[in-house]
Swiss-Prot record:
It is found in: Cell inner membrane. Its main location: membrane. Pfam families: CcmE. This is Cytochrome c-type biogenesis protein CcmE. Belongs to the CcmE/CycJ family. The gene is ccmE. Residues 139-148 have a biased composition (Basic and acidic residues). Heme chaperone required for the biogenesis of c-type cytochromes. Transiently binds heme delivered by CcmC and transfers the heme to apo-cytochromes in a process facilitated by CcmF and CcmH. It comes from Pseudomonas paraeruginosa (strain DSM 24068 / PA7) (Pseudomonas aeruginosa (strain PA7)). Residues 30-162 are periplasmic. Residues 1-8 are cytoplasmic. PANTHER family: CYTOCHROME C-TYPE BIOGENESIS PROTEIN CCME HOMOLOG, MITOCHONDRIAL. The keyword Acetylation does not apply. The chain crosses the membrane at residues 9-29. The lineage of its organism: Bacteria, Pseudomonadati, Pseudomonadota, Gammaproteobacteria, Pseudomonadales.
Length: 162
């Protein structure tokens, strides 16, 4: 092999190694930013990975909110109408967080089935429900009980007085 050809081969190989490393780093960064959504039913059935950051959503079960007296630790139960998952969170909950309302929690699922959340997102207003929560409720057949953000048996007064 002559010196010119050898030099070209080395340059081409160096470029290929550089491009391969860049693609590998980009894929690694993208994979770490992916937060897959799981319903309480999927989590209870063991479909959600442990020790991986996930999103879990549903409705906060009434009477399940437990606040620590001496810290910002909070525990509550989220349901999709079929199954439930307990969520532990350390921090200040959003102002719109209420029992019976839709939320999405981001965190890691522990081996005991409790989602340790580092972020809790509450729905925007009375009429909004996250698309993932709406789909989970529809799949479990519970959506009709929570139409327009109302739990079954609750009355809601909108601007028209209905």
């Amino acid at each position: 092999m002559n010196p010119v050809r050898k030099k070209r081969l080395i340059i081409v190989l160096a470029i290929l190694v550089g491009v391969g490393a860049a693609v590998g780093l980009a894929l690694s960064a993208l994979q770490q930013n992916i937060n897959l959504f799981y319903t309480p039913t999927q989590i209870a059935n063991g479909e959600a990975p442990t020790d991986t950051r996930i999103r879990a959503g549903g409705l906060v079960e009434k009477g399940s909110l437990q606040r620590s007296a001496d810290s910002l630790n909070v525990r509550f139960v989220v349901t999709d109408g079929a199954k439930e998952v307990t969520i532990a969170y350390h921090g200040i909950l959003p102002d719109l967080f209420r029992e019976g309302q839709g939320i999405v929690a981001l965190g890691k699922l522990g081996g005991d089935g409790v989602l340790v959340a580092d972020e809790v997102l509450a729905k925007h207003d009375e009429n909004y429900m996250p698309p993932e929560v709406t789909k989970a409720l529809k799949d479990s057949g519970q959506l009709k009980h929570y139409e327009n953000g109302k739990a079954a048996g609750e009355t809601s007064y909108n601007q028209e007085g209905k």
